[in-house]
Design a protein with these regions (language model features):
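Proteins synthesized as precursors that undergo proteolytic processing into mature forms
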Residues: 107-143, 255-263
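Catalytic cofactor-binding cores of redox enzymes
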Residues: 136-174
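Short hydrophobic/aromatic-rich beta-strand segments that constitute the beta-sheet cores
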Residues: 90-92, 175, 299-302
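A contiguous strand-loop segment
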Residues: 11-108, 136, 141, 328, ...
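Short, surface-exposed beta-strand-loop junctions and turns on beta-sheet-rich folds
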Residues: 34-36, 96-98, 171-174, 181, ...
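Short acidic-glycine loop/turn motifs at beta-strand connectors
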Residues: 22-25, 84-86, 158-162, 167-172, ...
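C-terminus-biased signal that marks the final domain/tail of proteins
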Residues: 8-27, 142-145, 150-151, 160-162, ...
Length: 339
């Protein structure tokens, strides 16, 4: 395994953005931003796939099916983001410098960081059930293997009823309600939420002159109600921009309208090659964007090179099997000629 691969899994400072969206159905997805792709796949974990959780003698081979984007190693899905067949979604995003995990303890259920997503999604049908699971677990610093150190992450967990953020830090294991349904990277979630106070005057409507009512000022362009909305690629700015975009978003409630709108929401923080230099002649880009219809079990995605929306429907597969079902990520741009 290349050293840079190990760097990524250890928590290299890549940037990501996750969001939820609700119309008639519930949608959940994220961007994954990094300087190169190294072999992601869409992975369906069927109901009878045997999970051998690292700190348990029990094999979990009867559970909810899961679909998501993963790096697969030794037939194990290392999920970045996923939903289960019941409509619960979860994603891990980089949290470098703040994430800290515990040693195993005797009075709680010990769960390795790399198995956190499948541990929750395989057993919990709802956010309420997940809360109960979280209250009795201990997130450990156990590595997947020598080549896969613990990634420094925090997590967004959501269903149609609400959204949580989970952060394991040196000062403890924190679970936060997330009223905006958005997560990026640093700083910790309470600080991300607090910074929204700075932008409460922003609006999608044209501004009124409160600067000096006696002074004749003109709105010389559309969109001036959102002057001051951050536009850079830092994690704090992306949090604010996607929160504003999502909270003011309007769309129809059909599947096509909802999916299209979700990609537009996360598209507001797309990273273009050349705008975020991480080393000489190396640039972070949005490798992929996902959108899951958590109700229907459909995983939609596009990539930096292929902006066509592609989809895998978990319910078109036999979910009562034991082996992972794998689909390659379609990276080549697909253009529909009309003549």
């Amino acid at each position: 395994m290349k050293a840079i691969d190990k760097y990524f899994f250890a928590g290299g400072k890549n940037m990501c953005t996750a969001a939820t969206y609700k119309t008639k159905d519930f949608y959940f997805g994220r961007t994954l931003d990094y300087e190169f792709s190294y072999g992601n796949e869409i992975a369906i974990t069927p109901r009878n796939y045997p999970f051998h959780f690292r700190h348990s003698d029990r094999v979990l081979d009867k559970h909810y099916a899961i679909i998501g984007m993963a790096h697969i190693s030794d037939s194990y899905p290392l999920y970045y983001d996923a939903i289960n067949e019941k409509g619960l979604g979860m994603a891990g995003l980089n949290f470098v410098g703040n994430a800290a995990y515990a040693n195993p303890v005797s009075d709680k259920e010990n769960i390795a960081q790399f198995e956190f997503i499948p541990w929750i999604l395989s057993q919990c049908a709802t956010l309420k059930e997940a809360r109960r699971k979280l209250s009795c677990m201990n997130l450990t610093n156990t590595q997947f293997s020598e080549n896969f150190p613990c990634a420094q992450l925090h997590w967004i967990l959501a269903d149609t009823s609400g959204c949580l953020v989970i952060e394991s830090m040196k000062d403890g294991f924190h679970i936060y309600d997330n009223p905006v349904g958005v997560l990026t990277n640093n700083p910790p979630f309470p600080q991300q939420m607090f910074q929204l106070n700075n932008y409460q005057s922003l609006s999608p409507r044209q501004p009124k002159n409160t600067f000096a009512p006696g002074l004749e000022l003109q709105s010389y362009s559309r969109g001036m109600g959102a002057l001051g909305l951050p536009g850079d690629l830092s994690s704090a700015s992306r949090f604010t921009k996607v929160a504003f975009t999502k909270m003011n978003s309007r769309s129809g409630d059909s599947e096509l309208e909802s999916v299209s709108q979700f990609f537009h929401i996360l598209g507001s923080v797309d990273q273009q090659r050349g705008c975020c230099e991480v080393a000489e002649n190396k640039y972070e880009i949005t490798l992929y964007t996902s959108c899951c219809n958590a109700i229907k079990g459909i995983y939609y995605y596009n990539t930096y090179e292929n902006h066509q929306i592609n989809a895998v429907d978990m319910h078109r597969e036999n979910l009562d099997t034991t082996a992972l079902i794998r689909y390659p990520v379609l990276e080549t741009q697909n253009i529909l000629f009309q003549n």
